[in-house]
């Protein structure tokens, strides 16, 4: 097994397991952020509505992220080391992980954004399945074109994902490295990696909630609207506090999800690396 398939399989297992376990919390978060509030958009009814689109996209999306992330960690580090030749090891590590995770997120969003559009519209419309929502988008009822409809909220998603991942992954890698060093190890066990992922994910989730809120509102719009006009309208009509709608479920979901997502990734990666020793070469 080569390093490409190692990252692909580890990422697929991580993404699918996380979405299956935490989908109801994601639905609650989406309905809290939707215009009209939680109960107007379905309350606790049908909290697994939209699961199909999430499951279909979770494996390829997570695989794309980890393939890109693991590849960039190895390939970018020599250049970053030269760029910061007088810098500390921690600065080089942090910069490497920020760049690698950002590239990984952009690649993953090629799959994730269309799936998010379908999923979130299904979560707030009580009569539609994921397939019916997708058919509605493909019919191009608003005449804006397939690309605009499927990738609605793309720029805002990237604006959310890059700050999120620039907080989560450098912190995650730092916590793992610090814990391993304290125990005289080169790497932490998968369960320790899961704890590090939970802490890093929770902090990143809470910090980037306003960006997630804006992404949700833009994706739920049936027509294209500029980010600036959406921010101004929401601020005037609903007040500044609404930008942190869903912060509780989002932080809880991503904190616990980070433990499963990164813990599963570490577990599968470790098992496959031991079974196929040459597959572990990409780890940085």
From Swiss-Prot:
InterPro entries: Mitochondrial_sb/sol_carrier, Mt_carrier_dom_sf. SUPFAM superfamilies: Mitochondrial carrier. It holds the Pfam family Mito_carr. PROSITE patterns: SOLCAR. GO terms for cellular component: mitochondrial inner membrane; mitochondrion. It is a multi-pass membrane protein. The keyword Transmembrane helix applies. GO terms for biological process: S-adenosyl-L-methionine transport. One of its GO terms (molecular function) is S-adenosyl-L-methionine transmembrane transporter activity. The chain crosses the membrane at residues 5-25, 50-70, 98-118, 153-169, 194-214, 252-272. Solcar repeats lie at residues 2-75, 92-178, 192-271. Keywords: Membrane, Mitochondrion, Mitochondrion inner membrane, Repeat, Transmembrane, Transmembrane helix, Transport. Signal peptide: none annotated. It is found in: Mitochondrion inner membrane. Present with 521 molecules/cell in log phase SD medium. Belongs to the mitochondrial carrier (TC 2.A.29) family. This is Putative mitochondrial carrier protein PET8. It comes from Saccharomyces cerevisiae (strain ATCC 204508 / S288c).
């Amino acid at each position: 097994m080569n390093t490409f398939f190692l990252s692909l399989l580890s990422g697929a297992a991580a993404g699918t397991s996380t979405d299956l376990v935490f989908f109801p919390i994601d639905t609650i978060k989406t309905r809290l952020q939707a215009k009209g509030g939680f109960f107007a958009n379905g309350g606790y009814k049908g909290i697994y509505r939209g699961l199909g689109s999430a499951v279909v996209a979770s494996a390829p999306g997570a695989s794309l992220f980890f393939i890109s992330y693991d590849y960039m960690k190895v390939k970018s580090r020599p250049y970053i080391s030269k760029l910061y030749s007088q810098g500390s090891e921690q600065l080089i590590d942090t910069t490497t992980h920020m760049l690698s995770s950002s590239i990984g997120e952009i690649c993953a969003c090629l799959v994730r954004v269309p799936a998010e559009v379908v999923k979130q519209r299904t979560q707030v419309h009580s009569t539609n399945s994921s397939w019916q929502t997708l058919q509605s988008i493909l019919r191009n009822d608003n005449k804006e074109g397939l690309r605009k409809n499927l990738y609605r909220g793309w720029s805002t998603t990237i604006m959310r994902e890059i700050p999120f991942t620039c907080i989560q992954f450098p912190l995650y890698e730092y916590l793992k490295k610090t814990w391993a060093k304290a125990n005289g190890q080169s790497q932490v066990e998968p369960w320790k990696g899961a704890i590090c992922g939970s802490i890093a994910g929770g902090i990143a989730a809470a910090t980037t909630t306003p960006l997630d809120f804006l992404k949700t509102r833009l994706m739920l719009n049936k027509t294209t609207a500029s980010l600036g006009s959406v921010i101004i309208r929401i601020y005037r009509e609903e007040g500044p506090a609404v930008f942190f709608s869903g912060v509780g479920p989002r932080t809880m979901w991503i904190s616990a999800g980070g433990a499963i997502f990164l813990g599963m990734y570490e577990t599968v990666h470790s098992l496959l690396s031991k079974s196929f020793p040459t597959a572990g070469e990409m780890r940085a």
